[in-house]
Amino acid sequence: MPADPYPRAVLDLLAAAGDRPVIEHGTRTVTGAQLLGLVRRLAAGLRAAGLGPGDGIAMMLGVTPEAFAAMIAGYAVGARVVGVRPGLPGAQARHVLRQDIAAIVTDADPAQGALTVAELLETPDDGGPLRLSGRPHDVARLVHTSGSTGTPKGCAQTYAAMDAAWTARPAAWPPAIKELASRLQRYLVFGSLASQVMMEYGVLTLAAGGTMVVADKPAFPDAIVEHRASASVITVPRLYRLVAAQRAAPADLSSLRALMVSGSPVEASRLREARDVLGPVVFHGYGQTETGTISMATPSDVPPSVGFPPDVIDVEIRDPDGVPVPAGTDGELYVRTPAQAIGYWADPGETAEVFAGGWVRTRDLGHFDDDGRLYLVGRTRDVIIVNANLHYAGPIERALAASPDIAEAYVVGAPDEDTGEAVHAFVVPAAGRTPDVGSLRTLVRDRLGDGCVPATITVIDEVPSGPSGKPDKRLLEPPDRTG
């Protein structure tokens, strides 16, 4: 491990970039030297505000050069950086902001007690060496899950783990990442830097000598055309819509060299179709918030493989008793990597369930072939992936059952052209009651957010029973919405 902690590797990349453009934001171009200057001033501002090692800093920021610099500055002072996604439902946002947060940093117009980027930038740079205060075993960042369990879980990653990641170190890149990095001349950035994927591929772009290009409106294919992007992250639903748009009215995507599909599995036939329509540009990444990237399929890999895990990542396929199984046999994936989270912040019960003996239990099912390629076949968890976000069925069922009109509620997922998967609910009415579907949708939205709202709600007399006599919602069939 280097003498200086994270983010030394990132700061070295910015220093090496010098006058090379590293971020384009509208009509503004920011060089490596300028971005490094922003990091230095923001770090000075955070220290002047009394913030340092171990302090939690919530970053409620848009996608700007200052936002990227603020995240790096938070690491420089040794804080626990907590990115807050825009649009997080109120109850979930309040939960995140109660997790030992010492300060909130915003773009402008702060709530009472918050700091703005502009205020922090008023602190002058003293011109001396930038002191890095991160301690190896301190938590460097919390990356929150989607919150579909009712409260988002904060995956806690230490400074030692951040330093162990390959992102900023070209010498450590596995072959698939090396191929991807060679295509990151102009990487499209959008959405939120609270996204683990968005931020880490931004750092990868710096290491590859490329430029991050900020898109205010991530509409595909328009954003690729407008910014002449060579690379972008894309969710499965967006990929499907892009392929359909290109079939109907092809746009000029000659600049595009890499689309990194993430967030949920891609059907093998749809991945082949995407490569047929878009060309050899589609990468398919597999990973989790808890582990980071586990493997990546390049355009030359044959679907449905998700590629080869790199040597620094251990992956075991285990049976229900926890015993490793041979190649070709399906089982649950357990993963161990130097860069993984150490657990969930302030959640010892869930941490004990998922993080045990140095391994992360993914609750995904898959197998290796004889050559070491990884394949995914399903999930052990009762979750539905909507727009690349995981939504647990249990909280949705409990929200529906909270209505006085409902006696029982069951939720299942099904493939959906627009969102990857969709939530479908089946409800048994309470005696003498007639459920109102609109009111039920509002109830779920208010409690859990838009992503958990069922696409369909079907009223049934009872749920089918399995051989054991217990209700078996796997026997419920969502309505066909393709017609």
Predicted regions and their residues:
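Flexible, low-complexity linker/hinge segments
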Residues: 1-5, 118-139
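Conserved AMP-binding/adenylate-forming core of the ANL superfamily
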Residues: 2, 21-50, 58, 64, ...
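Conserved pre-ATP/AMP-binding loop-to-beta segment of ANL
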Residues: 19, 127-144, 151, 177-186
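Conserved AMP-binding A3 loop
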Residues: 31-33, 140-167
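AMP-binding/adenylate-forming catalytic core of the ANL superfamily
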Residues: 104, 337, 342-343, 365-452, ...
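Conserved AMP-binding/adenylation subdomain of ANL enzymes
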Residues: 166-186, 192-231, 245
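Gly/Ser/Thr-rich phosphate-binding loop
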Residues: 207, 230-233, 245-303, 314
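Conserved ATP/PPi-binding loop(s) of AMP-dependent carboxylate-activating enzymes
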Residues: 308-312, 323-354, 389-391
